[in-house]
Each structure stands twice: as C-alpha cells, then as structure tokens.
Amino acid sequence: MAEKLHPRIDNGLPKESASFAGGTLVCACTSKPVKVKVKGQIAHNHACGCTKCWKPEGAIFSVVAVAGTGDVTVTENGDKLKVVDASALIQRHACTGCGVHMHGPVERDHAFKGLTFIHPERFVEDGWSPPGFTAFVSSIIESGVDPKRMDGIRAQLRTIGLEPYDCLNPGLMDYIATWTAKKSGALPA
C-alpha cells in the first residue's frame, strides 16, 4: 500500500512551466487570509521530513523551496503572522489563524542568509518548479512514523523521482561546507 507522503507528490510531481514568473501564496484561512507575493521561479524545491516544517493535514513530508528574500513580500493580513521559533535559523512566520507557515527568511550569518523558505503548494498559480529531492527523511520517525516503514517510504520516494537524503542533497551540502570553509579560512574567500 502506498504511503500518504504529501498531497502534491502522492500522484506524481507537479509540472513546471517555463512561463512561471512567481505568484501569490495564500494561507488556509477562509476569512482574511494571509497573502505573500513571490517574484520569479523558486529554487531547491524538495520534500522535507524535518519536524520544524509545516505540513498539510495527513502529510508526513512538507514541500519547501527558497526564493530570494528581496523577492518575497507580505501583501495582505501580515498582522496575523507570528514567528514560530525566534531562536531557529529559519524564521518561520506562521498564520495565527490556520497555522500555515507563510515564509521563513534566514537572517543570521549563514550560507542561506538572504533566502526565504516557502511552501510552494500554497501558490494560487501552477507552474512552480517541482521538488527535486527529499531531505531529512529519517526525521519522520521523530514525528511518529514507525521505523519499519522506512524502506518502503524511501522506495516510494525514488519511484516518484525524489532521491531520499538524511540531510540536504549533495550540492546544497557542498555549498554549506564551502561557505563554512571560506568563513574559517580553510579555503580562500
């Protein structure tokens, strides 16, 4: 039996459109929803199993991507947003009405500073870049998934076309390590 991973990947990956130029993310509130405008195509979209990311009801993974912080603007009902954990690297701003995480900028000194994490399934528009891998797969155990299901879940992710990792994908991990090495002087800046 197939696992319910996330509603936007359970039946295959969404299709990217070359004409997608950004759009509007909308929370789940039926009255006064929070709206966030994102300019341009998103990057590094992936399914994520961490316990920090917002997930739709019944999903064991989130779908999360990044955009440049300068390309992300709260346009309506921003007064409903509250930072979930001020000590976290990703400052996840959640709607106090429905709980959806609407945007999460990285503001501290980090390789991802200047990027904002978003959940692209909240776009009104279609055509955003689909997930390309799965991160922090083992972390779904921390949220209650039976470890005996993990081999099947990893196999299902691969069938969908999402390589499962227990960190980020190799390219992003190399980027973080390179940034850290330059910061420490181990590599030339």
Swiss-Prot record:
UniProt keyword annotation of S-adenosyl-L-methionine present: no
Keyword Metal-binding: yes
Biological processes annotated in GO: formaldehyde catabolic process
Catalytic activity: S-(hydroxymethyl)glutathione = glutathione + formaldehyde
Required co-factors: Zn(2+)
UniProt keyword list: Lyase, Metal-binding, Zinc
Top-level EC class as recorded in UniProt: lyase
Protein name, UniProt field: Glutathione-dependent formaldehyde-activating enzyme
Species for this entry: Mesorhizobium japonicum (strain LMG 29417 / CECT 9101 / MAFF 303099) (Mesorhizobium loti (strain MAFF 303099))
Lineage: Bacteria, Pseudomonadati, Pseudomonadota, Alphaproteobacteria, Hyphomicrobiales
